[in-house]
């Protein structure tokens, strides 16, 4: 009897790893969004509108901006949104010759923008015909909730939708501003 009980226990120990469900990955993965828009203006004109890190007046979601150190590396800015939410950012790379700069968010409430560990680059490129510009805005980030089973407003889809909305809204407003001459 003891021998058969031992055999059953040994079989259970051997079979357990084979019957256990596979371990699942946990936590969020880094997401990326890239949006581009063609603007009927030369790159220099477009860069003149967006090349100053301290000036986000072209973006309709920004009602106020304040910052320090212009467009120097480690310059900071605080963007205030219509709902009084704020986003604090720091400039990490700036290349006027390549018409590009990169920045990252240092502080934001996930209720304002449902992301964490956000970094972004905005670049102005010549259009195919030489008379237009392509503006590319790309970012990488994690969702606003770092653990498994995030609430809907802080999941991957919410983060991607929010960043996509920021980029599309900004790029469309930039195009309208430049092409209308305002």
Describe the residue ranges of each PLM region.
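A mature extracytoplasmic/lumenal domain signature
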Residues: 50-52, 83, 93-95, 105-109, ...
């Amino acid at each position: 009897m003891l021998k058969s009980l031992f055999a059953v226990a040994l079989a259970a120990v051997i079979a357990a790893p084979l019957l256990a469900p596979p371990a699942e990955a946990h936590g969020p993965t880094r997401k990326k969004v890239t949006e581009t828009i063609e603007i009927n203006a030369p790159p220099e004109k477009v860069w003149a509108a967006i090349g100053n890190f301290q000036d986000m007046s072209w973006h309709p979601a920004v009602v106020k901006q304040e910052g320090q150190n212009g467009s120097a590396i480690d310059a900071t800015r605080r963007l205030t949104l219509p709902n009084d939410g704020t986003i604090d950012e720091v400039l990490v790379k700036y290349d006027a010759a390549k018409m590009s700069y990169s920045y990252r968010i240092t502080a934001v409430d996930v209720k304002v923008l449902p992301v964490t560990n956000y970094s972004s680059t905005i670049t102005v490129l010549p259009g195919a015909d030489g008379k237009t510009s392509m503006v590319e805005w790309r970012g990488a980030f994690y969702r606003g909730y770092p653990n498994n089973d995030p609430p809907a407003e802080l999941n991957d889809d919410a983060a991607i939708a929010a960043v996509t909305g920021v980029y599309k809204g900004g790029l469309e407003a930039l195009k309208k501003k430049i092409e209308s001459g305002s």
